[in-house]
Regions:
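Conserved N-terminal helical subregion
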Residues: 1-3, 20, 47-171, 175-188, ...
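Conserved mid-domain beta->alpha element of the FAD-binding
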Residues: 6-23, 29, 157-158, 185, ...
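Conserved Rossmann-like nucleotide-cofactor binding loop
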Residues: 11, 34, 163
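Acidic/histidine metal-binding catalytic segments
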Residues: 63-64, 120, 258-275, 333-338, ...
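Conserved FAD/dinucleotide-binding core of flavoprotein oxidoreductases
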Residues: 80-105, 109, 143-150, 190-278
Length: 450
């Protein structure tokens, strides 16, 4: 089967690698004339690591990424409200890891070239539209040198991102997205490691502004320092839906004047940014089908979601595996695509809607509302505002929703703590032995939404 993939982002590239595992030799068409390691950080969840391992790139990925150990939440004053372990440190099968999106993309790019050949990726070729009949699909290409070309394939997988040309042709009635009123400011800062060098921080009152901070590279470019990724959400006039739109820190610094975290100067972190990118939170309505005959959508083209929680890229990894498996199982691409759609669309749409509602980040809003936006008189007062048991239930529901795979013998999805109550290991959030101890046999195991 002669398969085309539109888009050489992480989703399109890993799809090519999954297809190669099934015996296919796809061709990728990419608009840009040269792939470069652009962008900022991404949070690769446990289930995403599993997919990377299955394509044989886990060790290389580990070398370029940072293991996530702790996830800690703070109110608008820098007071801790909740913490949990991450990945294998919580009892999951794989790590959760932080990485620069561009470096991840380049790892996949090099691997595609190695396994499929350099001719497998056609750069500088924009897909303008498609036509199809009972025998195949015709893609109409516009090359950077001004040439127009039409190419023929048996099947087409569109992984052409949030501004997907294929999605607009397939669903013209849903082509206009809706701006949420919120813009993400995404930056990276080179600095000394904070805390243990393996912690993701969630800071702020979402009614004012939210901030996420995590390391994405140790000893960056031999500097001995850590490259730290940060993301700020704030209200702003609508801007272009483009990952590479540059912004300024001056618009967001005032939001964090009251934040006081003993191991991190948040305002200095923002001010020292190497670059800042703007990205508006755009609402794309969930689709009723990803399939049009021999053409199918994948990744952001199929299920663009608010980029919270690291699920956008990781869900594309799952898409890639399932679509490759179905194409290997069915000689008719339309039948294969329908089976893929049936397996993936409904559960992913649930995640899309959950991310639209803040996901687990809602706990910071809950605390802000319950305290009426005031600081806690004492850090221990947080248990009366947000009991650990209540937060644990919320986080467990989220982990089930996205399908985090538990390690054998572990039957719970979340066990929160407060870092100041740590006893066993100085400088660590909590004893890993306590976190990794198997749960009682009678504890119910949540079923994966996937």
């Amino acid at each position: 089967m002669n398969i085309a993939i539109i888009g050489a982002g992480p989703g399109g590239l890993i799809t090519a690698l999954r297809l190669q595992q099934q015996g296919f030799a796809p061709t990728i068409y990419e608009t840009v004339p040269e792939l470069k390691p652009l962008g900022v950080g991404v949070d690769i969840k446990v289930y995403g690591l599993k997919e990377i391992e299955e394509i044989g790139l886990l060790e290389e990925f580990r070398m370029m990424s940072v293991d996530a150990v702790d996830s800690v939440f703070y109110n608008h004053f820098g007071q801790e409200i909740y913490a949990e372990k991450c990945g294998v440190h919580m009892g999951y099968e794989h790590e959760q890891r932080f990485v620069h999106r561009g470096e991840l993309q380049m790892l996949f790019y090099r691997t595609v070239q190695k396994r499929l050949g350099k001719d497998a990726i056609v750069l500088g070729a924009r897909v303008g539209s498609y036509e199809q009949d009972n025998a195949g699909v015709t893609l109409h290409l516009e090359h950077r040198d001004g040439r127009s070309e039409s190419v023929r394939h048996d099947a087409v997988i569109a992984a052409d991102g949030i501004n997907s040309v294929v999605r607009k042709q397939m669903h013209p009635e849903l082509s206009e997205p809706h701006y949420s009123g919120i813009t993400m400011y995404r930056g990276t800062t080179l600095r000394e490691p904070y805390r243990d060098g393996h912690t993701i921080l969630h800071i702020g009152d979402p009614r004012i502004s939210s901030m996420i901070v995590y390391p994405i590279a140790d000893n960056f470019e031999g500097s001995g320092k850590t490259l730290v990724n940060w993301v700020v959400e704030a209200e702003r006039d609508e801007s272009v839906e483009d990952w590479n739109q540059l912004g300024s820190v001056d618009e967001i610094l005032p939001f964090y004047e009251s934040v006081d975290i003993d191991f991190l100067d948040v305002q200095q972190l923002i001010a020292d940014a190497r670059e800042v990118y703007l990205f508006p939170l755009i609402r794309h309505e969930p689709l009723e089908t990803w399939v049009d005959g021999r053409v199918v959508l994948l990744g952001d083209a199929a299920h663009a979601m608010y980029p919270r929680g690291g699920n956008g890229v990781c869900q594309a990894f799952l898409d890639a595996r399932v679509v490759a498996e179905q194409l290997a199982a069915h000689s008719d691409p339309h039948t294969a695509f329908l089976a893929y759609d049936e397996a993936r669309r409904v559960p992913v749409n649930r995640i899309v809607m959950n991310m639209r509602g803040e996901g687990y980040e809602v706990i910071r809003r809950m605390v802000a509302e319950r305290t009426e936006g005031r600081p806690l008189a004492d850090r221990a007062d947080i248990e009366g505002v947000l009991p650990l048991a209540e937060a644990d239930e919320l986080f467990s529901n989220y982990h089930r929703l996205v399908g985090q795979p538990l390690r054998a013998g572990h039957d719970t999805y979340s066990s929160g703590f407060r870092t100041w109550e740590a006893e066993a290991v100085p400088g660590s959030a909590i004893s890993e032995a306590a976190v990794l101890a198997p749960a009682p046999a009678e504890a119910p195991r949540g079923e994966s939404a996937l």
